[in-house]
Protein backbone atom coordinates (compact mmCIF):
# COMPACT_ATOMS: atom_id res chain seq x y z
CA UNK A 1 0.00 0.00 0.00
CA UNK A 2 0.83 3.69 -0.06
CA UNK A 3 1.24 5.64 3.17
CA UNK A 4 2.05 9.13 4.36
CA UNK A 5 3.50 10.21 7.67
CA UNK A 6 2.09 13.22 9.49
CA UNK A 7 4.21 15.60 11.56
CA UNK A 8 3.65 13.50 14.71
CA UNK A 9 5.10 10.40 12.96
CA UNK A 10 1.62 8.89 12.61
CA UNK A 11 1.53 6.61 9.55
CA UNK A 12 -1.71 6.79 7.53
CA UNK A 13 -2.65 4.46 4.67
CA UNK A 14 -3.61 6.25 1.47
CA UNK A 15 -6.77 5.18 -0.31
CA UNK A 16 -8.29 6.70 -3.42
CA UNK A 17 -11.92 7.87 -3.41
CA UNK A 18 -14.05 5.17 -5.04
CA UNK A 19 -17.50 6.71 -4.68
CA UNK A 20 -19.10 8.42 -7.64
CA UNK A 21 -19.47 12.16 -7.12
CA UNK A 22 -21.81 14.63 -8.79
CA UNK A 23 -18.90 17.07 -9.09
CA UNK A 24 -15.68 15.56 -10.47
CA UNK A 25 -12.51 16.94 -8.86
CA UNK A 26 -9.90 17.44 -11.57
CA UNK A 27 -6.27 18.15 -10.77
CA UNK A 28 -4.57 20.36 -13.34
CA UNK A 29 -1.23 22.00 -13.82
CA UNK A 30 -0.79 25.69 -13.10
CA UNK A 31 1.95 26.02 -15.69
CA UNK A 32 0.82 23.72 -18.54
CA UNK A 33 -2.57 24.79 -19.93
CA UNK A 34 -3.93 22.53 -22.66
CA UNK A 35 -6.57 22.82 -25.38
CA UNK A 36 -7.22 19.10 -24.91
CA UNK A 37 -7.98 19.70 -21.22
CA UNK A 38 -10.33 22.52 -22.18
CA UNK A 39 -12.09 20.14 -24.58
CA UNK A 40 -12.47 17.55 -21.81
CA UNK A 41 -13.89 20.13 -19.40
CA UNK A 42 -16.52 21.15 -21.98
CA UNK A 43 -17.81 17.57 -22.02
CA UNK A 44 -17.46 16.51 -18.40
CA UNK A 45 -20.37 18.35 -16.80
CA UNK A 46 -20.01 19.57 -13.23
CA UNK A 47 -16.39 19.75 -12.07
CA UNK A 48 -14.00 21.49 -9.72
CA UNK A 49 -10.43 22.33 -10.78
CA UNK A 50 -7.66 21.92 -8.22
CA UNK A 51 -4.32 23.38 -9.31
CA UNK A 52 -1.15 21.93 -7.85
CA UNK A 53 2.41 21.56 -8.97
CA UNK A 54 4.37 18.47 -9.97
CA UNK A 55 3.77 15.16 -8.22
CA UNK A 56 1.36 16.64 -5.67
CA UNK A 57 -1.36 15.97 -8.24
CA UNK A 58 -0.75 12.23 -7.91
CA UNK A 59 -0.80 12.51 -4.12
CA UNK A 60 -4.19 14.26 -4.09
CA UNK A 61 -5.68 11.35 -6.02
CA UNK A 62 -3.95 8.79 -3.78
CA UNK A 63 -5.29 10.61 -0.71
CA UNK A 64 -8.86 10.67 -2.04
CA UNK A 65 -8.91 14.47 -2.44
CA UNK A 66 -9.14 14.47 -6.25
CA UNK A 67 -10.63 12.16 -8.89
CA UNK A 68 -8.86 12.76 -12.22
CA UNK A 69 -5.52 14.13 -13.40
CA UNK A 70 -5.34 14.34 -17.19
CA UNK A 71 -1.75 14.99 -18.28
CA UNK A 72 -1.97 16.13 -21.88
CA UNK A 73 1.50 17.51 -22.30
CA UNK A 74 5.07 16.22 -22.30
CA UNK A 75 6.57 14.49 -19.26
CA UNK A 76 9.58 12.29 -18.70
CA UNK A 77 9.51 8.92 -16.99
CA UNK A 78 11.35 10.25 -13.94
CA UNK A 79 8.69 12.97 -13.56
CA UNK A 80 5.90 10.48 -12.89
CA UNK A 81 7.29 7.09 -11.81
CA UNK A 82 7.09 7.73 -8.05
CA UNK A 83 3.64 9.34 -8.29
CA UNK A 84 2.44 6.44 -10.44
CA UNK A 85 3.55 3.95 -7.76
CA UNK A 86 1.85 5.94 -5.00
CA UNK A 87 -1.47 6.10 -6.88
CA UNK A 88 -1.29 2.45 -7.93
CA UNK A 89 -0.73 1.19 -4.38
CA UNK A 90 -3.50 3.46 -3.07
CA UNK A 91 -5.89 1.70 -5.48
CA UNK A 92 -5.92 4.19 -8.37
CA UNK A 93 -5.17 3.89 -12.06
CA UNK A 94 -2.86 5.48 -14.63
CA UNK A 95 -3.63 4.82 -18.30
CA UNK A 96 -2.02 6.22 -21.41
CA UNK A 97 -4.19 8.09 -23.90
CA UNK A 98 -4.39 4.86 -25.93
CA UNK A 99 -5.88 3.03 -22.90
CA UNK A 100 -2.77 1.05 -21.96
CA UNK A 101 -0.82 0.71 -18.73
CA UNK A 102 2.20 3.00 -18.58
CA UNK A 103 5.42 1.20 -19.49
CA UNK A 104 8.88 2.44 -18.56
CA UNK A 105 12.34 2.21 -20.18
CA UNK A 106 10.99 1.52 -23.66
CA UNK A 107 12.27 4.60 -25.49
CA UNK A 108 15.65 6.28 -25.66
CA UNK A 109 14.26 9.72 -24.85
CA UNK A 110 12.26 8.46 -21.82
CA UNK A 111 9.25 10.60 -22.76
CA UNK A 112 5.78 9.47 -21.74
CA UNK A 113 2.69 9.44 -23.91
CA UNK A 114 -0.21 11.60 -22.69
CA UNK A 115 -2.02 9.91 -19.82
CA UNK A 116 -4.85 10.11 -17.30
CA UNK A 117 -4.52 9.30 -13.61
CA UNK A 118 -7.78 8.55 -11.80
CA UNK A 119 -9.15 7.14 -8.59
CA UNK A 120 -10.94 4.46 -10.61
CA UNK A 121 -10.05 2.86 -13.94
CA UNK A 122 -13.52 3.55 -15.35
CA UNK A 123 -13.03 7.28 -14.68
CA UNK A 124 -9.70 7.18 -16.53
CA UNK A 125 -11.28 5.33 -19.47
CA UNK A 126 -14.23 7.75 -19.62
CA UNK A 127 -11.92 10.77 -19.58
CA UNK A 128 -9.77 9.24 -22.32
CA UNK A 129 -12.87 8.52 -24.42
CA UNK A 130 -14.02 12.13 -24.11
CA UNK A 131 -10.56 13.49 -24.92
CA UNK A 132 -10.00 11.28 -27.96
CA UNK A 133 -13.57 11.70 -29.25
CA UNK A 134 -13.34 15.48 -28.97
CA UNK A 135 -9.90 15.53 -30.61
CA UNK A 136 -11.10 13.40 -33.57
CA UNK A 137 -14.33 15.39 -33.90
CA UNK A 138 -12.50 18.73 -33.96
CA UNK A 139 -9.98 17.43 -36.51
CA UNK A 140 -12.77 16.06 -38.72
CA UNK A 141 -14.80 19.27 -38.41
CA UNK A 142 -11.82 21.47 -39.34
CA UNK A 143 -10.98 19.20 -42.26
CA UNK A 144 -14.58 19.31 -43.53
CA UNK A 145 -14.69 23.11 -43.34
CA UNK A 146 -11.41 23.35 -45.28
CA UNK A 147 -12.57 20.93 -47.98
CA UNK A 148 -15.94 22.67 -48.34
CA UNK A 149 -14.44 26.14 -48.89
Walk through the language-model features, giving the residues of each:
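Short low-complexity, flexible loop/linker segments enriched in glycine and/or proline
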Residues: 86, 105, 109-114
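Paired acidic/hydrophobic, glycine-rich loop segments that form the ligand-binding mouth/hinge
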Residues: 67-71, 93-96
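Acidic donor-binding loop at a coil-to-helix junction in glycosyltransferase catalytic cores
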Residues: 78
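Hydrophobic residues within well-ordered alpha-helices
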Residues: 26, 60-62, 82-88
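Acidic, metal-binding active-site segment of PIN/NYN-like and related structure-specific nucleases
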Residues: 92-108
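Short secondary-structure boundary segments
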Residues: 30, 73-75, 97-100
Amino acid sequence: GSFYIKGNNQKTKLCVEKKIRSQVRIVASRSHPSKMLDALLEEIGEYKIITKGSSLKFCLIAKGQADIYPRLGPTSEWDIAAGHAIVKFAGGSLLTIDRKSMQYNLTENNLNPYFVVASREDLALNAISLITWKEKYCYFYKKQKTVGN
